[in-house]
């Protein structure tokens, strides 16, 4: 009897040891998994359209020392197939972005001349602080705000393979892109297990976008032709800017509606941002952006954001981020566009304006009355995406 009791006791103690061992093993495994997840690179796509303030938002990320940033890598795809359409190029753009997110820069071989190349072969490479500092270029400290103008002079001759090295040395990879007119093309990236993708969807008042496009017509001529696609030959030249805006506005509507149909887990990887909200409260909105992707808002970046949005005038170059009064820039269409153009544009983009929270003006007097706030706080995005 005593032997039987001892045997049962030993079996009980043995089972407890096994349970404890399993618990320790599972705890260690969970801890290691969490640590691996925390080390996993974060991929961020700033999704926008032309002349919507996306260069500034790209710089908000790109100036952070933990970020590898590229501005519009899909430019290379579109400039290779200038006779194609945006819809036909979606797949090629998506595949290029996936490769760049994974720091595989060999994807550019299909869109660049063969043979040795420099990092200056990349479109707007000098906008990337990561390509202007170590390990790529030693002229600029990694923890200081980089100057694209000076970087272009000093760092352009670095070999192209340094781009991949720089990418792999950062924990965040951020790409800014304006050449997606549909969310459907992005679905494979959102569900790709090799990516940790977050999407920042930036929009801007279509009237401000239209005004800015008027000032950059020559620079955007190829992009506009690709957007218009088969409609290019059938639409009068004077109507083409409005039709291009109609397509762009519809794409923003489609993206927002598509996001609302995604599973909640994927919706949590999406952040909606209006340019006007950003320039009204740049520090608060930048804090929101950084929190969304897991970046710290460092003191020197807070100072830079304050200064770059509180400069004088309208800025020196349409495609560069420099000190300007960002709030005045966002309102410039109200005193510079004739009401006839505004009215025609509102007809083309009415659905997008209602959805995104931009109030229409019904007269020249309303347009010029700057005390009349045309930014609505009660819009569908505020109801669906309440974070921030």
Swiss-Prot record:
<comment type="function">
    <text>Sulfotransferase involved in SELL/L-selectin ligand biosynthesis pathway. Contributes to generate sialyl 6-sulfo Lewis X determinant (also known as MECA-79 epitope) for SELL recognition, a prerequisite for continuous lymphocyte homing into peripheral lymph nodes and antigen immune surveillance.</text>
</comment>
<dbReference type="Pfam" id="PF00685">
    <property type="entry name" value="Sulfotransfer_1"/>
</dbReference>
<dbReference type="InterPro" id="IPR000863">
    <property type="entry name" value="Sulfotransferase_dom"/>
</dbReference>
<dbReference type="GO" id="GO:1903238">
    <property type="term" value="P:positive regulation of leukocyte tethering or rolling"/>
</dbReference>
<keyword id="KW-0472">Membrane</keyword>
<dbReference type="InterPro" id="IPR027417">
    <property type="entry name" value="P-loop_NTPase"/>
</dbReference>
<feature type="transmembrane region" description="Helical; Signal-anchor for type II membrane protein">
    <location>
        <begin position="8"/>
        <end position="28"/>
    </location>
</feature>
<keyword id="KW-0808">Transferase</keyword>
<feature type="topological domain" description="Cytoplasmic">
    <location>
        <begin position="1"/>
        <end position="7"/>
    </location>
</feature>
<comment type="subunit">
    <text>Monomer.</text>
</comment>
<keyword id="KW-0333">Golgi apparatus</keyword>
<feature type="glycosylation site" description="N-linked (GlcNAc...) asparagine">
    <location>
        <position position="307"/>
    </location>
</feature>
<keyword id="KW-0395">Inflammatory response</keyword>
<dbReference type="InterPro" id="IPR016469">
    <property type="entry name" value="Carbohydrate_sulfotransferase"/>
</dbReference>
<dbReference type="GO" id="GO:0050901">
    <property type="term" value="P:leukocyte tethering or rolling"/>
</dbReference>
<comment type="pathway">
    <text>Protein modification; carbohydrate sulfation.</text>
</comment>
<feature type="binding site">
    <location>
        <begin position="204"/>
        <end position="212"/>
    </location>
    <ligand>
        <name>3'-phosphoadenylyl sulfate</name>
    </ligand>
</feature>
<keyword id="KW-0119">Carbohydrate metabolism</keyword>
<dbReference type="GO" id="GO:0000139">
    <property type="term" value="C:Golgi membrane"/>
</dbReference>
<feature type="topological domain" description="Lumenal">
    <location>
        <begin position="29"/>
        <end position="388"/>
    </location>
</feature>
<dbReference type="InterPro" id="IPR051135">
    <property type="entry name" value="Gal/GlcNAc/GalNAc_ST"/>
</dbReference>
<dbReference type="GO" id="GO:0005975">
    <property type="term" value="P:carbohydrate metabolic process"/>
</dbReference>
<keyword id="KW-0325">Glycoprotein</keyword>
<feature type="glycosylation site" description="N-linked (GlcNAc...) asparagine">
    <location>
        <position position="328"/>
    </location>
</feature>
<keyword id="KW-0812">Transmembrane</keyword>
<dbReference type="GO" id="GO:0006954">
    <property type="term" value="P:inflammatory response"/>
</dbReference>
<dbReference type="GO" id="GO:0001517">
    <property type="term" value="F:N-acetylglucosamine 6-O-sulfotransferase activity"/>
</dbReference>
<comment type="similarity">
    <text>Belongs to the sulfotransferase 1 family. Gal/GlcNAc/GalNAc subfamily.</text>
</comment>
<keyword id="KW-0735">Signal-anchor</keyword>
<keyword id="KW-1133">Transmembrane helix</keyword>
<feature type="glycosylation site" description="N-linked (GlcNAc...) asparagine">
    <location>
        <position position="369"/>
    </location>
</feature>
<feature type="binding site">
    <location>
        <begin position="50"/>
        <end position="56"/>
    </location>
    <ligand>
        <name>3'-phosphoadenylyl sulfate</name>
    </ligand>
</feature>
<protein>
    <recommendedName>
        <fullName>Carbohydrate sulfotransferase 4</fullName>
        <ecNumber>2.8.2.-</ecNumber>
    </recommendedName>
</protein>
